[in-house]
């Protein structure tokens, strides 16, 4: 054992033989600091106790273990503490203990979800979890999904799949519709997809903050007259400000009649659809072609975590799967 496990260059990486004692020392010390921060939350409050945190650039030869942990403590003291019972201002719940362990294991394994051979167990776990969510949401056996680092990316994946499925990947007149209270991430998605601002059509809401069906029909008719082809309509299951739920069943009926992809942004409220809570009544999310679920909100899964569920996984595969000549493709799952 060394006196300073950080600066002993023999132990920069976990060893493939031996006890990994240096790693254990650092893990234990880190655990003690974070657990004390949790334990002190109620008496210290959710807001930072130190607002003078200073960022420091990496040094060529590193820092001692004591200096490093002093800076870690400063970082923690300058952080928002979601464990405090009064930290209810945003959708940032305390992390589940088991989720903290999951992050630790994922960091230690450091497997690459690019291909099955690089992450054999985790790739299968991802597929299994998405299938589980799909079944709980009422989708058929054809459904599946993919995990992503946040709701914005899940929404983006859904929109790209919808546009590709409609055969409008290169159509400059391809548009999609959202409510005026939909999440701001859709503006980002529009830009990333190479579309102009006017390719995103915002529909007015009613007095309750829900997408107005009369206004929706007006916008659809206008798009038809102007020769604009709609590749998706987005319904929100829990808007950011008011928690409003768009009329999913009525929107679904229009989408089926006009052969338009229905995507549900359930980043906030979607997680309730796997429960028996009253919010789940009369909300058939399985009517959609796709839905975004964010376990990091409300469910207590560590950031960032999001899942996109698609009613037919083959559409997602056809949209995003590519050949990887430098890795094995045998028994691959969607990554």
Question: Which residues does each PLM region occupy?
Answer:
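Active-site phosphate-binding strand-loop segment of PLP-dependent enzymes
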Residues: 211-263
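Acidic/histidine-rich catalytic neighborhood
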Residues: 222, 269-290
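Active-site C-terminal subdomain of aminotransferase-like
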Residues: 283-335
